[in-house]
Amino acid sequence: MGKVFAVGVGPGSQNYITEIVRKVIVGADVVVGYKYTLDIISSLIQGKKIHVITMEDQEKTYQQIKKELEGGILVVPFTGDVNFSESEVVDRLIEIFGDVEIIPGISSIQVAASKAKIPLDKSKVITMHVTTSIEEKKLELQKAVVDGYNIILIPRPWPKDPKKHFMPSEVAFYLKKNGFDTSKIPVHVFESLTNGKEQTFTGSVQELEGKEFSDLSVMVISQTRSESYISF
C-alpha cells in the first residue's frame, strides 16, 4: 500500500493553499476529489491521474484505487479545512486505507470570522453540512443565540429533499418559529469566499426569509461587543 493524504485546500483561491499542502499535491500520483475542489488546485495536478467523484460514486472509486495504488501516493483534497465538516468522508478513508495523513487547511469559517471581525474564541461554530440528523445542532443554535455567542454556521444545501434543506432562509424561519425576534438578530451571509465571486449580505436574520443563497455560503450572527485589553 502506498501513502494516502487527506488535505485541506482552502475556500476557493489558490492564495489560501498552504505551502505544505502544495508540496503534497505536487508529489501525488493520484488525486481524487469533487469538481469544485479539484478546480481550486487545477494548476497543481496537471499530468496526474485524476478521479472526479460525487457522493454517489465515491465509494466505488476509493475501492478501485485501493486495488491499484500499490506504492503510489494518493491525495484526497477537501475544500477548506479537512478537519471541519468532512469527518464522515475522512473516517471512511481511514477505514479503507488504514493510515491516512491529515493536513489541515484554511477554512471558510476563518475567512468569514475575519471579514465579520469576530473572534473565534467568543463564537460557536456549527456545521449543518452533514448527512446525519441535524436536530441536536438546531438546538445548539438556539442555545448559542440565547447565551449571546457569536455564531458561525455552515448551512446544509439539500434541494432534492426539502425536509433536509437548511439554508439561511430555513434558519430564519426556524428561529422565528421557536420564539426568537429575528428582526433584532444581526447577520452576515458570505458566499463564495475567496474564489473571485464573493457576495455579502448584511442585515437581520428576519431579512433572510425567502432569500436564496449558493451552496458555498457561511452565516455569521454577531452578538458580542468589542473588548480590547485597555478595558481591563
Short names for language-model regions:
Residues M1-I103, V111, Q206-E209, L216-V218:
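Class I S-adenosyl-L-methionine
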Residues G2-A6, V145-F232:
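A contiguous loop/helix-start segment that scaffolds small-molecule binding in enzyme catalytic cores
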Residues S13, G80, F84-Y149, T202, ...:
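Class I SAM-dependent methyltransferase SAM-binding "motif I" and its flanking Rossmann-like core
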Residues G33-Y36, T54-E56, T79-D81, H129, ...:
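Structural motif
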Residues S42, S85, I134-E136, P162, ...:
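Generic domain-boundary/flexible-linker signal
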Residues E56-Y62, S108-I109, T131-I134, T194-E198:
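A short acidic, often aromatic-flanked loop/helix-cap motif at beta-alpha or helix-coil junctions
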Residues T61-I65, K137-L141, V171:
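Generic hydrophobic alpha-helical segments
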